[in-house]
Amino acid sequence: KDLLFLGTEFGLYASVDDGDKWSRFKGNIPKVAIREMVIHPREHDLIMGTHGRGIFIIDDITPLRSLSDSILDEELYFLPSRPYFISSMGGSQSFRGDDEFIGSNPRDAVYISYYMNKRHIFGDMYLEVYNEKGNLIAELPAGKRKGINREAWTPREKPPKVPSSNVLSSGALFGPTQLPGTYTVRVIKGDKSFDGNVEIKFDPTLPHSKKDREMQLTTLRKAYDMLENLAFLDAKIQNVMEQIKELEKDTSTIFRSASK
């Protein structure tokens, strides 16, 4: 409730203490006149009209809404973000109705947001993601700047190994999406660690039942495992074929030597 935005002739300003202190909001927002603003009721995006330079959108201001004076003193504090929804996409058109973005689409990723009261300079700093079983499933770089850092994690498993083929198919370029649930995110900052969490959910706008969605994910994982097993068998066959070729070369050499 203490978060305020102010559009001025020289860009966007924000306050997290009900207007006592103001700071210019940078984040790729230029010093242009902000004439009108609206917060999208579903996506929680801040949409700004400049009436000259176009429209600027700040995706998901949920992390900003949780900022307070006490948080600003924290060494590192995880900020809430909207859940990631598993959607059903097509090849070139996803048929998502008013969920379809016409401008530059936000990256299809889980956003991990955290605040730091000072820039991290010395020592390692990176992010780890753990599933509900406590298994490490992803590691990615972590933002080190003072203020709000927002990192994007693509919640997919690595692409499956596939058998060799002369035909190009894009179906195996991506791994399956991680299962719905709550995932632990951990920032390793020097010799310290800080934990937060993010959520992955089924898209509530889709008509499919939870049972159907779970069946789809189970089938995808079975296909993933089958591809990996097939790739393993293919590699063994290719190895045997190479050995046969080498033996044929050796046998041919022996026959030629014996016939002299």
Segments from the language model and where they lie:
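Extracytoplasmic/secretory ectodomains and luminal regions
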Residues: 68-260
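Beta-propeller blade termini and top-face loops
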Residues: 1-101, 107-110, 115
